[in-house]
Amino acid sequence: MNDERVFGITTGTAATAAALASLLCLKGCEASKVRVRTPSGILEVDVEYVERISGDTARACVIKRPYPDPDVTVNLEIISTVQITGTPEIMIRGGEGVGIVTKPGLQVPPGEAAINPVPRRMIEENLREHLRDDEGAVVTVSVPGGERIASRTMNPRLGIIGGISILGTTGIARPMSTEAYRESLACQIDIATARGFRELVFVPGNIGERFAREYFESIEDERIIQMANFPGYMLEEADGRGVERIILMGHAGKLIKLSAGIFQTRSSDADARREIMAAHAALMGASRDTVTRIFNDGTVEEMISELEGEGLTGRVFNSIADAIRERFNERFSFDTDVLIFSLDGRILNSNFKTKRNHRFTEVF
């Protein structure tokens, strides 16, 4: 089960292992490895250090070891301090470097430490095996450097402040897995719908978000949803959560892929930008030479320049926006509007309804 060359451990497993090592120390066993019960089975986890602080308190550290994944939490120290109490309750708290939830809609309510339900259960179940019926514990999880690392995660966007989240659903971190990242993206929708928002602005990333903020006279932060390279997944999640209208905004380079039904937009998986642009240019009457140049251009911005030379920019991007709406109507039940931008912030299509002073609908 345990192969550090292939899998890593989640921050939840690291926190659980550190808590278990702390408790075992208080029970008279100082362990350099612990066996942690996880949803995926038993994992053996190395303990960096464990120390007794007082008669009823100990702390231990587990390092989140590297594995084949660009995980920003790799090499962080996950420290759990355990104090045995005389009541059967196990309380779990966040310390230094563990974020605090500030917005409704996540798995943890506002005001609580960002330690998700599965890690909380793992800590409780693993400790309970070694506590008497009349004993409980206070567990404080801390992550030195967690606040600094958190700026490189989705936490600031999700309203989790002051540190990282203690996460995990299986106990193991799978290399190059997109599942956890997609789930963190979908949390944006949970936060928006928890506020009663049923009309959202979907953007590919930071450039699209900048366009949205500059375009609308007034818009709440939570209403702008970043899709990254997973528009299909994110749009399905929105549809399943009762979102009624989506305004799609972003740079042409990302959005035109949706017009061809490409709902996973990472270039290494699917590109087709030149084929899409050449096809719509030809449909709108571009000359053969222009279509050929578009097909051979290296960037979408160059393709836009070719269209401007023939005065076809608006017609071509109206055609692309229509194709996007058609694709969305085939798959989703919400209403859609589309605004396609160039890198310098110009709107390339004109067949949209959403104005700058748009009043968003809400359901409470």
From Swiss-Prot:
Principal EC category: transferase
Sorted UniProt keywords: Cobalamin biosynthesis, Methyltransferase, S-adenosyl-L-methionine, Transferase
One of the GO BP terms on file: methylation
Metabolic or biological pathway: Cofactor biosynthesis; adenosylcobalamin biosynthesis; cob(II)yrinate a,c-diamide from sirohydrochlorin (anaerobic route): step 6/10
Signal peptide: none
Record-level Gene Ontology MF annotations: cobalt-precorrin-5B C1-methyltransferase activity
Catalyses which reaction(s): Co-precorrin-5B + S-adenosyl-L-methionine = Co-precorrin-6A + S-adenosyl-L-homocysteine
EC number: 2.1.1.195
Family assignment from sequence similarity: Belongs to the CbiD family.
The name this protein goes by in its record: Cobalt-precorrin-5B C(1)-methyltransferase
Originating species: Methanothermobacter thermautotrophicus (strain ATCC 29096 / DSM 1053 / JCM 10044 / NBRC 100330 / Delta H)
Gene: cbiD
